[in-house]
A protein has these predicted regions:
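Bacterial C-terminal helix-turn-helix
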Residues: 2-18, 22-87
Length: 87
C-alpha cells in the first residue's frame, strides 16, 4: 500500500481521529466536574499499548515485521513492549 493510499479510517469508514475525539468527549463527560490530571500521558499510554498489542497480533508476534509496520526501530519496539508488559 503506498503512502497515498493508506487509510486513516476504522473499519466503518470513520477517521480514527474522530473516534479519539468521541472517546475524549465521553471521558470528560464522565468526570462529572472533577479536574483531570496528566491527560496527555494517559491518552498516549492507552493508545500506544493498544496499538502495539494489535500490531503484534497482526504480525504473528514477529517483532521485525511489527517494527517495520510501525516505522520504528526493533529495539525501540522491544523497549515499549517490555514497558507495557506485552513481551
Amino acid at each position: 500500500m503506498t503512502a497515498n493510499k493508506r487509510k486513516k479510517f476504522n473499519g466503518e469508514g470513520e477517521k480514527l481521529s474522530h473516534q479519539v475525539s468521541k472517546s475524549m468527549r465521553k471521558y470528560f463527560e464522565q468526570l462529572d466536574g472533577e479536574s483531570p490530571n496528566d491527560v496527555y500521558n494517559m491518552v498516549l499510554k492507552e493508545v500506544e499499548s493498544s496499538l502495539l498489542e494489535i500490531v503484534m497480533q497482526q504480525c504473528d508476534d514477529n517483532q521485525t515485521r511489527a517494527s517495520e509496520m510501525l516505522g520504528i526501530n526493533r529495539g525501540t519496539l522491544r523497549t515499549k513492549l517490555k514497558a507495557y508488559k506485552l513481551l
